[in-house]
Amino acid sequence: MKKANKLELKEARHMVLAAVRKATEIGVPETVCVVDDGGYPIVLERMDGARITGPQIAWNKAFTASGHKRSTHLFNAQPNGPALPGNEAFGIQLSFEGRFAIFVGGFPIVVDDEVIGGIGLSGGNGEQDTRCGVAALEALRELLAPQGLTVLAQADIKK
């Protein structure tokens, strides 16, 4: 039987705090959602002034990143993104009752080479959502480093 790392509330809150700190620094009201490896929210936070649509969008991005083990923007990356017209996953955004997000702002949480969850952000443009998401992943990396755990902290993640 395989022993697996599990994302817990402490780590999820730490990530959300880092994302909100970055969003505040760059002046963007974000919604941030951290999900477990099953795609269910551990923490969902909407900053004051963030759009009312943000919670669902952030959750969808986190769900997709966790479940499909890749950053959501990679589905549409030129020239061979799998969700582009003519490619193998064209139309995938219609699956899971429309919850499958194929645009920027969702990142898998990878610890010791295993996807243990996802983080989704909504509120800024693609660059802003990415900056906040990477800040959250970097914060998790710093938190877990003393335990000897490695965390991927970058925008382009595909497992």
Each predicted region: which residue ranges?
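Flexible, solvent-exposed loop/hinge segments and secondary-structure transition points
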Residues: 1-159
